[in-house]
């Protein structure tokens, strides 16, 4: 494991913890897209179906369990425990416009036409666009809480660091996964506008807002 992957994993974990603490401490999921969190839960579920059939390392298995557990916990908090605070009126992105094309693409473009491989590919494609309902929700409400922007920043940073991880692995291990790289680039591009606003506004103590 190289420093970029480890740093990326830590940023990903930090983003998840920030989100869970934000919801739990405020006893509210206001400003959080439940649809994005459902998509992330779907991502981890379809990606880690090999949890009980293959073992790479204790670290790898532990992170899989943590990601899945936190994803399910987040969905539970939004749609059950703090359901009364969920802003469904603004969380209106049509997720079928993401899931259906991604499902079709994963069947057509994959490394191996087997159920587990197709589902893994589906998770890679879906993760690249899963944040869109959250960004759409922010654009509709006009602004986002500072703690929510921190969550998004670490989530975007995780993906950017993984791009460097792939460059490292190609340079030193000869590893090249075009599907993961293209999906990662797409995901990072989606965060570019947010990164700019985060640096120019949030870090200067201003509220973040996305253009409607």
Curated annotation (Swiss-Prot):
Q: Which UniProt keywords apply?
A: Cytoplasmic vesicle, Endoplasmic reticulum, ER-Golgi transport, Golgi apparatus, Membrane, Protein transport, Receptor, Transmembrane, Transmembrane helix, Transport
Transmembrane annotation, as ranges: 5-24, 33-52, 59-79, 93-110, 117-135, 150-168, 179-199
Where do the record's region annotations for Important for recycling of cargo proteins with the sequence motif K-D-E-L from the Golgi to the endoplasmic reticulum lie? 204-207
Give GO terms: molecular function aspect only. ER retention sequence binding; KDEL sequence binding
Keyword Endoplasmic reticulum in annotation: yes
What would be one Pfam family of this protein? ER_lumen_recept
Q: Which residues lie on this side of the membrane: Lumenal?
A: 1-4, 53-58, 111-116, 169-178
Q: Where is this site: Interaction with the K-D-E-L motif on target proteins?
A: 5, 54, 117
- Membrane topology (UniProt): Multi-pass membrane protein
GO CC annotation terms, alphabetical: cis-Golgi network; COPI-coated vesicle membrane; endoplasmic reticulum; endoplasmic reticulum membrane; Golgi membrane; membrane
Cell compartments where the protein resides: Endoplasmic reticulum membrane; Golgi apparatus membrane; Cytoplasmic vesicle, COPI-coated vesicle membrane
Q: Which family does it belong to?
A: Belongs to the ERD2 family.
**Record-given protein name:** ER lumen protein-retaining receptor 2
